[in-house]
Amino acid sequence: MTRLYTEEFSSEQLVCSTCPHFEECGSCQLQHISDEHYKTWKADRLKTLLAENELEIEEWLEPVFISEGGRRRVTLNALRHENEVFIGYNKYHSHDLAPIKNCLLLTPQLQSIVEKLPQALKNIAHKNHAIELLVQEADGGLFDCVITGLDETGARQTGSIAAMAEQCGLARISFRKDAFSKCETQVSLTPIKKTNGAITVDLPAAAFLQPSAAGEAALIDAVLQGLSRHKLGKKDKVADLFSGCGTFAGHLLNKYTVHAAEGDWAMANSLVEAAKGHARFSAEVRDLFKEPIVGRELRDYKAAVFDPPRAGAKEQAQMLAKSNLPVVIGVSCNPSTFARDAKILLAGGYKLKTIQMVDQFTWSTHTELVGVFEK
């Protein structure tokens, strides 16, 4: 049962879920709330969390809500039992699989691939051995797939993997032992690229992409709007920290001089290669948890954008707080660690000017936000 927080809502606020898997699947928690009350609850929950952390916010911008049917990346679990493969999400607070036939969150193209996976995996998945699949869409409707927990290959299996790529419409399939292991490409039918504003990267396997194109656009717009409050030109340097494959860097490059720093070697290297030939763009492989950009390096910059993973950016926030950057923009998928990092920036003399909530984790308790800090 995934009907969370039911005690917080009156019976008038509850609705019947349109998803047949809602009672078992652990992916969505809030499908049983009316759309109006869902949006109010999401926004109020974020405001309450930040207020509890004693953050003074000058302006709350109108929240952005991304509707279902737009998710272009998904992580699924698969389990083969006898000659049948079951695909789905884990049950809520459990490692047990909740098989699904379809998911209302996904784009039609991604849903079509998910429907074909059970048959395609029959000759690849081992009996009673759970595996994880990441499938995501890049430029041109090309799909990348990474299978975690299955690292054995052989002539027969290689043929099955190639057949899976053809059957499911996957441009590339890679294996990795676990989430921390290097991806080993098994089949690559077409080069996969991702264009972000002024740059195009060769997308590494398992590279991070925002869950939805609409959510990505909303976050980019929020960042650019935050910087537009300041009179910066193409010669002014902006640091893009925890840059991934350049989601923000490429769009910043249209207006400013940009330096990107990313700790994941594959993603950072894709930016290093993309930077060749760009006079106003540079990139480096840098673990910002262990080696944050410090004050003396920030002297030449006019702004910084940071978009860390869920763990936040404590070490980097401490360095930014000591800087004299007129504007720092934080993007976060975890309001709790954002609040911690924001308190560090405020203690360093920054003011939290605006908060923009972007809800692209539809029907879940998670949300994303963009905060603009000024000094």
Task: Provide a role label for each language-model segment.
Residues 4-17, 23-128:
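Extended interfacial segments that mediate partner engagement and assembly in macromolecular machines
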Residues 65-72, 135-136, 240, 245:
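Feature of Fe-S/electron-transfer and energy-metabolism proteins
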Residues 77-81, 136-140, 374:
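Short beta-strand micro-motifs enriched in acidic
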Residues 96-131, 137-139, 151-174:
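Internal alpha/beta scaffold segment
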Residues 82-91, 141-148, 181-183:
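Short, well-ordered strand-loop elements centered on a beta-strand within folded domains, enriched
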Residues 3-9, 123, 152-375:
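Rossmann-like S-adenosyl-L-methionine
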Residues 68-72, 141, 365-366:
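A short, glycine/Asx- and small/polar-enriched loop/turn
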Residues 60-67, 132-136, 178-182, 356-360:
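Short, solvent-exposed loop/turn elements at beta->coil junctions and helix N-caps
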